[in-house]
Amino acid sequence: MASPRHPVSAHAVALVQMDRLQTFAFSVCWSDNSDTFVRRSWDEFRQLQKTLKKTFPVEAGLLRRSEQVLPKLPDAPLLTRRGHTGRGLVRLRLLDTYVQALLATSEHILRSSALHGFFVPKPLDLEPMLPPGSLVILPTPEEPLSQPRGSLDIHSLEAQSIPCVQPFHTLDIRDRPFHTKAQEILDILLRHPSGWWLVENKDQQVAWFPAPYLEEVATCQGQESGLALQGSGRQFCTTQAYEGSRSDELSVPSGARVHVLETSDRGWWLCRYNGRTGLLPAMSLQPEGLGSLLGRPGFPDSAGADKVAEDRTIPPVVPTRPCMSAIQSRCCSITRRALGQEQGTRVPR
């Protein structure tokens, strides 16, 4: 059965990890020009593939292989480097390729109820906050084989002391436990564009540390959110579909992302959606959770510096660690010796 609204494009944006459970976040654009964020597990993607093969046996190549148009769903190797998280990031790239190939197939597959039901936001996708302990890991783009001579991706600076926003646990460059507390002061030794900075604590332990957990980065991100908010309105998502009955009302599907321009205690808020401005019932709106994290890495949208302390209750986004070869290739020999890399130390995994 064909659905009136169908997905037209989608791309992977993040790996969301909680303990051993991994979900893959996608930004989905629909035929009515709306866009949503959804999270799906690897098993859910496998089940989608089985459903599509059963629903479209010809397109799956079950009758004639030459007629196959449905893409295959490959898996990441079991022995992927960097363990569970590394395998999740490999799967994220594979799923991105798979979904884009899937949405490039024939029109009747795009309009199928199976595909619509998979990508339509579920109640879990509409929650204003992620489960406690969740880590949102953003993939880094694939590095080119060669870069222009003289380009530096790691920037050194004099040691600067910055407090931590929240507690964080990792390993130092010698694989020893490295634990920090909220407001603990760390000395910044090197900054890397991947979001992992080289820091030193009061015990002279050196470790790679996620920059969003540091006060300077978090404050800057909060200020940027406030500036953007003044011009475009705070972003919310709809918890249910609404069909406008008057000319000054908007019609929106469930899970749509809207900008709230003006709130009111009368129960109707002025919003902008899909290029139109109109009223929506406040009871059908809630602050975006995943979308805010992915739209502004580190913290959700904020109305100003007064909300920074409140926003810190949400764990910052942890960027993907840079690989060992990327760091070594951009460090001079003096830096390598300082890090002890020539004695066999490495970036913790």
UniProtKB/Swiss-Prot annotation:
Tissue expression pattern: Strongly expressed by colon epithelial cells and to a lower extent in small intestine, uterus, stomach and testis. Expressed in different parts of the inner ear including sensory and nonsensory cell layers of the saccule, ampullae of the semicircular canals, the stria vascularis and the spiral glanglion neurons.
Membrane-crossing residue ranges in chain numbering: none
Matches recorded under Pfam families: PX, SH3_1
Annotated ranges, domain SH3: 160-219, 231-290
Membrane association type: Peripheral membrane protein
The entry's keywords: Cell membrane, Lipid-binding, Membrane, Repeat, SH3 domain
Gene Ontology MF terms in the entry: enzyme binding; phosphatidylinositol binding; superoxide-generating NADPH oxidase activator activity
Region ranges (Proline-rich region): 315-324
Keyword Cell membrane applies: yes
Tree of life domain: Eukaryota
Record-linked SMART domains: SH3
Disruption of the gene: reported phenotype: Mice display balance defects being unable to orient themselves with respect to the gravitational force. This is associated with a defect in otoconia biogenesis in the inner ear.
Protein name: NADPH oxidase organizer 1
Originating species: Mus musculus (Mouse)
Name of the coding gene: Noxo1
